[in-house]
């Protein structure tokens, strides 16, 4: 049995796994009140970074993709409420995509391989994808052009600020968080992305019946995810424990490399209660 864990508050969110060479870099926001499993006697620091900035080179092709496709597919960060989290309201997704369709948020897409695949196999859904690693954004823009995708929009901004100030409650049909940085060392576990404050924020923004899908190849992190998600009162597990891999999520180059190294991959799919 995994040891009982204590959860510090996280106010800055990673947007991709460090092992994928991702980067983030924006200021934190005021911490949320933890719920669903955070012990009352835990000290909650004002700001705990869940990432470090890593350099990355944008290729000429990625730069061209920014120039040609950025105006259409990269959404500017425009907070509705710059101080307090926004109240329930209609999201701006209809204006972003030009249609009314189920909206899925992705936090951290690396180089966009899985994102583009999922958008292809689920053309009925729209995908709002947060990533601040510019080479990754450029790579996804290239994939959008290559596959003629129209149901992806990118926000090159810190995900927590997007969640707090651009997404109203009950606006999301789903959330994808695939292979976030596991922060292997014990002293860095406080920096892990999947912790009660973030999960509570996301659960509040899911529609009834909406889902939160996480995946990781680090077993201790998978167990932590299972405990944190299971403690959120607005969510229920769709499986007895870890879930079978949903058919829409592909095996990426990153994941196949992990499997060759003997890293088992765990999926977790939780649903917003009605």
Swiss-Prot record:
Active-site positions on this chain: 181
GO CC, any one term: tRNA methyltransferase complex
Catalytic class of the enzyme: transferase
Family membership: Belongs to the class I-like SAM-binding methyltransferase superfamily. TrmB family.
Xref: SUPFAM superfamilies: S-adenosyl-L-methionine-dependent methyltransferases
Organism this protein belongs to: Verminephrobacter eiseniae (strain EF01-2)
Protein name from the UniProt record: tRNA (guanine-N(7)-)-methyltransferase
Catalytic activity: guanosine(46) in tRNA + S-adenosyl-L-methionine = N(7)-methylguanosine(46) in tRNA + S-adenosyl-L-homocysteine
Keywords: Methyltransferase, S-adenosyl-L-methionine, Transferase, tRNA processing
């Amino acid at each position: 049995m995994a040891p009982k864990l204590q959860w510090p508050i996280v106010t800055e969110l990673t947007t991709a796994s460090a092992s994928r060479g991702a980067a983030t870099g924006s200021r934190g926001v005021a911490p949320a009140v933890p719920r669903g499993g955070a012990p009352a006697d835990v000290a909650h620091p004002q700001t705990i970074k869940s990432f470090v900035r890593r350099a990355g080179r944008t290729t000429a092709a990625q730069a061209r993709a920014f120039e040609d496709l950025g105006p259409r597919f990269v959404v500017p960060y425009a907070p509705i409420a710059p101080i307090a989290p926004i109240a329930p309201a209609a999201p701006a997704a209809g204006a972003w995509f030009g249609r009314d369709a189920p909206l899925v948020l992705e936090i951290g897409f690396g180089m966009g391989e899985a994102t583009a695949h999922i958008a292809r196999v689920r053309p009925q859904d729209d995908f709002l994808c947060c990533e601040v690693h510019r080479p990754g954004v450029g790579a996804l823009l290239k994939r959008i052009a290559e596959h003629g995708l129209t149901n992806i929009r990118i926000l090159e901004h810190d995900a927590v600020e997007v969640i707090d100030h651009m997404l109203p409650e009950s606006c999301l049909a789903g959330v994808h968080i695939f292979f976030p940085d596991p922060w292997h060392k014990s002293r860095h576990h406080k920096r892990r992305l999947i912790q009660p404050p973030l999960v509570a924020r996301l659960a509040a923004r899911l529609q009834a019946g909406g889902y939160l899908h996480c995946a990781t190849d680090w077993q201790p992190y998978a167990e932590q995810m299972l405990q944190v998600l299971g403690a959120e009162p607005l969510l229920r597990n769709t499986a007895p424990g870890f879930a079978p891999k949903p058919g829409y999520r592909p095996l990426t180059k990153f994941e196949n490399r992990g499997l060759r190294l003997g890293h088992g991959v765990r999926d977790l799919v939780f649903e917003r209660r009605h």
